[in-house]
């Protein structure tokens, strides 16, 4: 009988592998000038490759789901809010500050004032920053997490509605009454619901909640329908809806991937786990490099493939260095307290 059941614990067990897949999707999405589609003469194949690249930002939504899931486990083990904030901020701030100093002050010459605005999340609301919005969002979600956790833990599935509906209403009000502000922050605030869904999945995972595997069929069907609708461009006339469409794409992807992944410790899974370990550092570094290193390359092939391979290798090297430095800083800060 157990063989006919899908256990939500599989999401937690597969979390690191899925994180690696999400990281690769983000790399693909930020490869806007990688012209591999030009290899093919078929317009259909070109369009499919372009569509796959452009929908790679679903990796961000997957990040948020897995983040919410992981936080549920972490907070359930230690619900001391002070300890929670300390752990979370020590995880994200050292690497973020290092990259922010390097890119903002040293490379861009934007000055210390802009660096402070970036660090205090103000650039998210003013529309000045298109690179650090994710980390601004994550810090905000960390601050709100204890409330989210309490609601989901107490009200279960009803808690999702209690949290998401007010957020959707607030988002809509901002869009109606201050469209400029909405355009600045929609990339972040429209993704809060998927983070909340991740918390709920964390609860179900920690409980070992099981469903009949047959339910995975309509989940796959939902995913297929949403991807098809996105591909044919049905949401182009209402662009603000697209962010929410990824809600209904990312959750099925996470569930189906956790079902497929067998955790057999094979070479592919180990590779994805290694990438997933550096997901934050890669996210911080890659987009900046891919935008700003192009002038360092004298020769470009017509597909820009050599350029992207070089940038990816450099990203992985710098991500490893950044993680080591930020971990050392975090360790010293913990010892000094």
Could you say what each language-model-derived stretch is?
Residues 70-73, 149, 199, 203, ...:
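Short glycine/serine- and small hydrophobic-enriched flexible loop segments
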Residues 14, 57-61, 127-139, 183-199, ...:
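Membrane-interface micro-motifs in multi-pass membrane enzymes
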Residues 1-170, 213-217, 266-268, 274-278, ...:
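Membrane-cytosol interface segments of multi-pass membrane proteins
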Residues 30, 283-286:
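Histidine-centered divalent metal-coordination motifs
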Residues 4-5, 174, 183-196, 203-281, ...:
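Alpha-helical transmembrane segments and terminal signal-anchor/GPI-anchor hydrophobic tails
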Residues 30-37, 104-108, 150, 175-179, ...:
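Transmembrane helix-loop junctions and nearby membrane-interface residues
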């Amino acid at each position: 009988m157990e063989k006919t059941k899908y256990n939500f614990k599989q999401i937690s067990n597969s979390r690191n592998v899925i994180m690696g897949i999400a990281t690769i999707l983000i790399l693909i999405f930020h490869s806007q000038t990688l012209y591999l589609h030009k290899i093919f003469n078929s317009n259909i194949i070109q369009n499919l490759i372009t569509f796959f690249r452009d929908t790679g930002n679903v990796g961000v939504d997957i990040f948020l789901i897995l983040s919410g899931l992981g936080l549920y486990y972490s907070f359930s083990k230690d619900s001391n809010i002070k300890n929670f904030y300390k752990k979370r901020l020590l995880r994200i701030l050292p690497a973020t500050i290092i990259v922010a100093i390097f890119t903002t002050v040293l490379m861009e010459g934007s000055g210390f004032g802009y660096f402070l605005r970036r660090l205090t999340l103000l650039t998210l609301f003013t529309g000045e920053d298109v690179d650090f919005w994710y980390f601004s969002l994550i810090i905000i979600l960390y601050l709100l997490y204890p409330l989210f956790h309490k609601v989901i833990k107490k009200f279960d599935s009803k808690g999702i509605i209690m949290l998401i509906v007010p957020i959707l209403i607030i988002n809509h009000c901002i869009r109606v009454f201050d469209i400029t502000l909405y355009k600045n922050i929609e990339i972040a605030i429209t993704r809060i619901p998927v983070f909340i869904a991740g918390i709920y999945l964390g609860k179900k995972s920690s409980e070992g909640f099981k469903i009949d595997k047959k339910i995975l069929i309509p989940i796959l069907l939902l995913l297929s329908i949403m991807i098809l609708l996105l591909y044919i461009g049905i949401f182009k006339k209402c662009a603000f809806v697209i962010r929410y469409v990824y809600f209904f794409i990312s959750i099925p992807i996470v569930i189906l991937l956790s079902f497929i992944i067998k955790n057999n410790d094979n070479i592919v899974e180990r590779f994805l786990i290694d990438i997933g370990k550096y997901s934050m550092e890669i996210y911080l570094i890659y987009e900046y490099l891919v935008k700003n290193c192009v002038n360092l390359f004298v020769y470009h092939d017509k597909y820009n493939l050599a350029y992207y391979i070089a940038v990816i290798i450099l990203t992985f090297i710098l991500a490893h260095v950044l993680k080591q430095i930020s971990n050392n800083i975090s360790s010293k800060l913990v010892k000094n307290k």
